From Swiss-Prot:
This is Protein PRRC1-A. InterPro entries: ITPase-like_fam, NTPase/PRRC1, PRRC1. It comes from Xenopus laevis (African clawed frog). GO terms for cellular component: cytoplasm; Golgi apparatus. It is found in: Golgi apparatus. The keyword NAD does not apply. Gene3D superfamilies: 3.90.950.10. Belongs to the PRRC1 family. One of its GO terms (molecular function) is protein kinase A regulatory subunit binding. The keyword Transcription does not apply. Residues 1-27 are annotated as: Disordered. PANTHER family: PROTEIN PRRC1.
Length: 442
């Protein structure tokens, strides 16, 4: 394959860097000491002579067949290639003699550079390239087979650079770092200085426990306002879906009212009015006696009958003498000549706070003939004739008109029920009563 003139007939492909500048005796396969990339030994391989114009070989590309083969700077004789193995054996000598006893012939010219020092340390073992991205410089390593790469043979794999990551130096953080207890991670986080104000607030908040926390939140005016609005909204939804739930939801609190009647038309109207004004109120009914005529005539008789109902309950012990009570009494009055009206008197009596208030419902017109019938049905010697009639206007209307109830005939004449009339008056009464109560009661 080689001629005596030293002309190379092998393909002009660049051998791997492991063969560049390597001077090995017959028993030595590798040199572990790193050498310069261009000229590393006085002995050059017979198959390659690096060009002096390149500072460092970066890539090796096979030359086309049209390019003439490279010549070595010194005529060399052919030497059989040394087998390349993955295991490096220690060199036989620690210094380079002037002449070798190996079959390789000596150069006829002196070397241009001094020989590199050799040591006895085994060379590094070739490792696979790292999986990470290139960080530092790179080095090329490969195995080269001279039997391949000819025309018609197996193609030669071009040399690819393999990268090695340079060691990264981690500078210490000047911020104080707190060690992580019970964790195997090396990540540390800066420790922030504690705020004494936050610590004081935490201690003060935890001094009262969970109840102290709720007490503090409930005492906040803004929180209380939000809670009240939320509660009112929920009550509105519930009472809209089921109006009968209003009395159960709003029953409670310090406001306790007794109505001097067991009729639902009166008790329900007063309860709804006071719960609307005070939010929470307990309203119950007791049957009180008016001790006047069943159909009072005139304002004085109506007011007398309402007050007598309260007094009768207190005399009988049905309610406490200091118990606030509300009484409703309907009467008729001739406000204009031959014009009669039905009116309801609503009063509240609170002996504890010395409050006594009166109001009246709207006036409902009553036809004159029905009032005259009630007067004719009342005996002349009726003992309570001074206060009114023995027959009510409702009884007369019930006898005279179909589908009319004696207790709620107002809706047939006005389209507005008696309960609505009492509710309107009772709500106005509750508003006046609330204004006169001491603030601690509210």
């Amino acid at each position: 394959m080689m001629e005596e003139s030293g002309i190379e007939t092998t393909p002009p492909s660049t051998p791997p860097p492991s063969t560049i500048g390597t001077s090995v005796p017959a028993a030595t396969t590798a040199i572990s000491t790193p050498v310069p990339p261009i000229f590393s030994s006085p002995l050059a391989a017979p198959v390659f002579s690096p060009l002096p114009s390149f500072a460092q070989p970066i890539f090796s590309t096979p030359l086309p067949s049209s390019v003439p083969p490279l010549r070595t700077s010194v005529p060399l004789t052919y030497a059989p290639p040394l087998p390349v193995t993955g295991v490096h054996s220690p060199p036989a000598h620690t210094s380079v003699p002037a002449a070798f006893s190996s079959p390789l012939p000596a150069f006829s010219s002196p070397p241009s550079f001094p020989p590199p020092p050799l040591n006895t340390t085994p060379g590094p073992v070739l490792t696979a390239p790292p999986t990470g991205p290139p960080v530092g410089g790179f080095s090329m390593s490969s195995h080269y087979d001279i039997t391949k790469g000819h025309a018609g043979r197996a193609p030669q794999t071009p040399l690819m650079p393999t990268y090695s990551a340079a060691p990264v130096t981690v500078l210490p953080n000047p911020v104080i770092q707190a060690p992580l207890a019970g964790s195997g991670s090396s990540i540390t986080f800066p420790e922030e200085p504690e705020d004494s104000r936050v610590h004081t607030m935490h201690v003060d908040g935890s001094a009262g426990g969970i109840w102290g926390f709720f007490k503090g939140v409930a005492g906040n005016p803004m929180v209380k306002s939000v809670l009240d609005k939320t509660k009112h909204s929920m009550e509105t939804v519930i009472t809209t879906l089921d109006p009968g739930m209003a009395s159960y939801i709003r029953t409670g609190g310090e406001m306790d009212i007794v109505v001097t009647s067991v009729k639902e038309v009166k008790v329900a109207a007063v309860r709804e009015a006071f719960q609307e004004v005070f939010g929470m109120a307990v309203v119950t009914g007791e049957d009180g006696q008016s001790n006047i005529a069943p159909q009072p005539v005139g304002y004085a008789a109506g007011l007398k009958g309402a007050q007598e109902r309260i007094d009768s309950l207190r005399r009988s012990g049905m309610i406490h003498e200091k118990q606030p009570a509300v009484s409703v009494e309907n009467f008729i009055a001739e406000l204009l000549p031959d014009k009669w009206f039905d009116i309801g008197c609503v009063i509240i009596d609170d002996p504890t706070h010395g409050i006594r208030l009166e109001t009246f419902t709207q006036a409902t017109p009553v036809p004159l003939e029905y009032v005259q019938q009630a007067q004719n049905l009342t005996p002349q010697d009726y003992n309570l004739r001074w206060s009114g009639l023995s027959v009510t206007v409702g009884e007369v209307l019930e006898r005279s008109l179909a589908h009319v109830c004696r207790t709620d005939w107002h809706v047939a004449f006005t389209g507005m029920s008696r309960r609505q009339m009492i509710y309107s008056a009772a709500k106005a009464l509750a508003g006046m009563y609330k204004q006169r109560l001491p603030p601690r009661i509210l």
